[in-house]
């Protein structure tokens, strides 16, 4: 297709004076977006489509070269002199050839091809450009530092709105470097929220032979400034630039780039700080890698979206760092090993960090960025580098069980050796003693089949068994491992319990390869079973508490009957003298209280008024009740008021006793839930206070017998709850007989 003479006038006549297309015009446009100028018409072949400049004139004799291009204040007159086809026009004026379409930015370059020109220009990426900015706002700023070939504002293909960034092309790399040094983070365009970012576009620096020594730094404090970051890296060499990556709200993403003047200080800073230095306000050390430039993927051309072609969207800049920084900013332990960031393969890091390099400020819209945090950075230690499942997978990760995770670096030193399951869970024994203690508090007197630790070995496992009947079978197998692991020594199981478990057929001789498989699910189920165990123990304690309350109430009724009988017997046996006779055994009710309530203080049970009355109640041979006064020897059929008050006082006393008993039972139940069983035996061994001297000897004998019964709980031999119950019953019977 011929484009050279589409808009040209007659070749022989030349351009009209003052016309934009002639040699006298100052401004012109090229045939395409990337080139300008065009060859003249005439008898020769049509000019090259992408040629710059070209000979004007017509016919067989070509005139002077028509270079063209707009004037800018940076270049001197020598750059625009005529001749040679470089910015030359007829008569030495700044114009373009008389024929050929006009280029938008008009940079005549003689007869060079487009391929050569593509290798000469340098493309810069400009960030933080206002969405309302135009080319006239951007171009003058950059023309102060060199010859601007083109300014391309990036717009959305669907909406047509600007994306807040643009590309600027310079003719030489020196001009581009000059613009970067003068404008990067130093100039704010009108209407912008912050200074513009000026840096090389994708692959431009490498294409021109310049190498940038830039580090990608993660785990930065989001409140840190560029100055604070520079102070961290300054001791290792001259820091040329610090760039903090920010989101759409201008908030730091916790990562950025630090540029050094040479490779040696950059390497020294990375070796000294990566994995070792923790910034103030952060929980994990810095993660530092070289910010290698992005390399084109196979099948991806430089004109594609990643290199500023059609379909490019700067919004994907936000997608570049959101995923890695979201993973990096999450706390994963107080100390992270230095090698936790190493990728699975030595060459994977450059490709994964290329998206953050200096030469890739943005990526195509909707592009997927693969970061090392997804594959290798925080890869569970049970996986090897090649993604295969290693031998460490027998036990699930401790982070799923609510325990303190082991150091991540252990996975690198384990290799392929087989590790015992209990050694790989150092946090596991922290849960075992709690469950043992809680289980030891639950119902030690219900039957001989249950033992103190609720480790019910016979057939069906109780609620206190580990892992619901599966982990209990592993205890005999893993018993040598428990002895080897120092952290498991907190689990103190009586020898009778362990011996009885070893004696069970079918559970002792389990194959060794079954143990890891059976340990997987029970260990994960233990935290969820703890509340169920506590609820079951609480229900059992409540039932035992209710039964004890009923027994106490029956004892109180019997106590009242015995008091009345004793009082009546004393009244019948009294001598007939005139002196007042009082009850000779006021402390008898306290002496007959069973041993399980012997810790109630005497002061709380004694009423304010002495429980004495001269009237007693009797029954006549006919079956009628009458009342007799032992002092006046008076008998009445009606109940005397003095006797009515006496009965009320007795009722109040009984109510107070019942309340105190209930409170005491509740306290004991709470202590059983919170303290080990050894501490439970002490309340039962406390002696009764303020007992009459006549009964102290007998009470001491009862307490000694109780001590003998309860000390059997602490012996490592076989424990029979029926013996404990028999001891309590015998103590109660002796108390009644006294």
Curated annotation (Swiss-Prot):
InterPro entries xref list: Hud_Sxl_RNA, Nucleotide-bd_a/b_plait_sf, RBD_domain_sf, RRM_dom, WW_dom, WW_dom_sf
Assigned GO CC terms: nucleus; spliceosomal complex
Tissue spec. comment: Mostly expressed in young flowers (panicles) and stems, and also present in young seedlings leaves and roots.
Chief location bin: nucleus
Biased composition (Basic and acidic residues): 109-118
Disordered, as annotated region: 1-118, 292-414, 566-594, 670-738
Biased composition (Polar residues): 342-358, 383-401, 575-594, 723-732
GO molecular function: RNA binding
UniProt biased composition (Gly residues): 52-70, 81-98, 301-311
Record-annotated RRM domain positions: 122-203, 213-293
GO biological process, alphabetically ordered: cell differentiation; flower development; positive regulation of mRNA splicing, via spliceosome; regulation of cell size; regulation of flower development; regulation of seed growth; regulation of timing of transition from vegetative to reproductive phase
Domain WW: 609-642
Summary of the function given for this chain in its UniProt record: Plays a major role in the promotion of the transition of the vegetative meristem to reproductive development. Required for RNA-mediated chromatin silencing of a range of loci in the genome. Cotranscriptionally recognizes aberrant RNA and marks it for silencing. Controls alternative cleavage and polyadenylation on pre-mRNAs and antisense RNAs. Regulates flowering time, seed size and cell volume, probably via the modulation of cell size.
Quaternary data: Interacts with FY. Binds to SF1, FIK, RPRD1B, Os09g0509000/LOC_Os09g33480 and MADS8.
Protein name: Flowering time control protein FCA
Organism annotation: Oryza sativa subsp. japonica (Rice)
Gene giving rise to this polypeptide: FCA
